């Protein structure tokens, strides 16, 4: 019997895959537990529509990430912060990924999730710092952060 897997089944198939399986296994296990559906014409058309929608959503998300990357990598896109500092250029406090994301949104209107930033530890010195951001699978950008001393 041909079935369409609705979930991953270890050793049998992945979600969205169409496979031939024994009738008893399909009826008594896969279909009963909601792991698969019978591969009828209607179900096949639904599967194609769902795959097309998922692909379109993936492409839209990737295009949005590319757009954000292009905006971040412009020469004039530098996130500026003013902070109090000591004599050795060390900040009183620090600039975290949360503050960087807030600064990006406030200064340029760019929204980025703070979890996408690769900042091992907060910025604690004055000057320029490059912060890498993984915006999407295969789309990475560099955010330039400039910390100056507050008067």
Swiss-Prot record:
GO MF annotation, one: rRNA binding
Record-level GO BP terms: translation
InterPro entries associated with the record: Ribosomal_bL9, Ribosomal_bL9/RNase_H1_N, Ribosomal_bL9_bac/chp, Ribosomal_bL9_C, Ribosomal_bL9_C_sf, Ribosomal_bL9_N, Ribosomal_bL9_N_sf
Cellular component, GO annotation: ribonucleoprotein complex; ribosome
Domain of life: Bacteria
Keyword terms, alphabetized: Ribonucleoprotein, Ribosomal protein, RNA-binding, rRNA-binding
Protein family (similarity comment): Belongs to the bacterial ribosomal protein bL9 family.
Functional summary from the UniProt entry: Binds to the 23S rRNA.
Cross-referenced HAMAP family: Ribosomal_bL9
Name the UniProt record assigns to this protein: Large ribosomal subunit protein bL9
């Amino acid at each position: 019997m041909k079935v369409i897997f609705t979930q991953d089944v270890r050793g049998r198939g992945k979600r969205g895959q169409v496979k031939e399986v024994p009738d008893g296994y399909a009826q008594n296990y896969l279909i009963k537990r909601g792991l698969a559906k019978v591969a009828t014409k209607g179900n096949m058309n639904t599967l194609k529509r769902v795959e097309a929608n998922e692909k379109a959503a993936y492409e839209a998300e990737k295009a949005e990430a590319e757009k954000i990357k292009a905006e971040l990598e412009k020469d004039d896109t530098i996130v500026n912060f003013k902070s109090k500092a000591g004599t050795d250029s060390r900040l009183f406090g620090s600039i975290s990924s949360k503050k960087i994301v807030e600064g990006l949104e406030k200064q340029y209107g760019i929204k980025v999730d703070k979890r996408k930033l690769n900042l091992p530890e907060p910025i604690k010195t004055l000057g320029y710092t490059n912060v890498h951001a993984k915006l999407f699978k295969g789309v990475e950008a560099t955010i330039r952060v400039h910390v100056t001393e507050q008067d």
